[in-house]
């Protein structure tokens, strides 16, 4: 992971990027080896961030890059496919659009006027993202053989592909567009089990619309994103047996 992040940094610099922030976002959000990062890069690390994978976003950034992403829950041949948490979330829709982590996070960046420039991962997530954002450069570093198996590039080959693509993506940034959902906004979550929806509907603003489905209406996307983050965390409490 650290090598691929460093490759993206080096490529972005070659393309003209001057300031870079890394938000460590996989699993417990403590994966990136800081001593392998350039001295002038800022690193956001640690779990339970208020805005999770999108912590640190704000006005002033030229673009975002998603490194090491995966397919959404339920996608065939998506390597380790899930949407934030496989234990609790089966499907997420915003305004009727089925969303992966990449789409959910890209829309948060889009709220601040930041376009997604690059995504790396398996073919399934690359095709999912570019179908919604054709200006995004997708770097396919592995082909899924199933949920737990993949035909992958070597780390050296993957890093070269990421480095080259990141450089070009920064150069092409003026052609990219922020990804957004038009208001009014509706979030729908299908949980893995009905008991998780039992917990989520306890929160103000959520409506139960099905056995495993809840709905939340909002005025802007940050409200949608915060509601989603709260939902998967509270819904996860249903997985704990006292």
Give the location of each predicted region:
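Short, well-ordered, mixed-charge alpha-helical segments that flank or form enzyme active sites
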Residues: 29-32, 72-77, 124-129
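Divalent-metal (Mg2+/Mn2+/Ca2+)-assisted nucleotide/phosphate chemistry catalytic cores
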Residues: 39-43, 50-119, 137-138
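C-terminal accessory domains and tails appended to enzymatic cores
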Residues: 158-242
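Active-site rim beta-loop-alpha module in soluble metabolic enzymes
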Residues: 111-116, 120-123, 127-168
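Short internal beta-strands
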Residues: 20-24
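Short catalytic helix/loop segments, enriched in acidic residues and glycine
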Residues: 1-10
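Residues at the starts of beta-strands that form the adenosine-phosphate
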Residues: 18-19, 115
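Glycine-rich loop at the start of a catalytic domain that most often binds anionic cofactors/ligands
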Residues: 28-41
